Structures are given as structure tokens and as C-alpha cells.
Amino acid sequence: MAARMRFFRKIMSAGVALDAKSDELTPADLGSVDELALYIVFGPGTSAGSVQVESAHVSGYTGVWAPEGSPVAWAAASRVHKVSIAGASFVTRARLSVAIVGGSVDIYAVGNG
């Protein structure tokens, strides 16, 4: 049986600043998904930056979140990167681990189940 898309939404718009955080994906979003895909879109004019996908045990956690893989580093302007996470995560977000230079980044989330 083919996976069905459970949701698609933009979780960060025009991110630039170091440590800027996306909207959180919570159990309400992730409860019915088997796979989460994040599309990280470095905009035109960008020349540097990095995005770290992270998870935590509760929404709004103020400590250091657990990294989900390595940071996604800028490679080219107007380029899309995809990060896929299989299995359960309670709360997930993206954080700019290196400020975006020369433009901004948008991040979209897709939940499949």
C-alpha cells in the first residue's frame, strides 16, 4: 500500500538569523505519520548558512534539542535539500545553526503515513 500524505505546510518563512527556529511539529502533526520529510529551500542570492533538524521530548523545550542527523549546509543558491526522518519523533523543528548570508531560507514539512 502506498503512503498517504497526512500534511504539508511551511514551517519557516524567510529565515536568516543564527538560531532562528521553525514552527514546531507536535504530536498533533506527527501522530499519524510514518515518515517526515523537510524540504529546506535556500533562496536566490544566498551564499552561506546551515540548518539543523532537531527533536525534543516536549513542545517548547528550552534546553538543547537532540540533532536529527548532520546540519544541512548551504551548497548553492536556489537549491532544495531534503531531510527524511523515519520512525517516531515527539516534537521536531529546524534551527538555523549558521546564519543565512545573502538571502533567506524557507522550510516545508510533509508528513506521510
Regions found by a protein language model. Give the residues of each.
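Aromatic, loop-rich ligand-recognition surfaces of beta-strand-rich domains
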Residues: 25-49, 108-112
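Solvent-exposed serine/threonine-rich low-complexity stretches and specific carbohydrate-binding patches
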Residues: 9-14, 65-76
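Exposed aromatic-hydrophobic patches
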Residues: 23-28, 78-86
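Short, surface-exposed beta-strand/strand-loop-strand elements in extracellular ectodomains
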Residues: 46-60
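Transition segment at domain starts
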Residues: 1-33
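Edge beta-strands of jelly-roll/beta-sandwich modules across compartments, strongly enriched
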Residues: 51, 95-113
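Noncatalytic modules at the cell exterior or secretory-pathway interfaces
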Residues: 33-40, 85-103
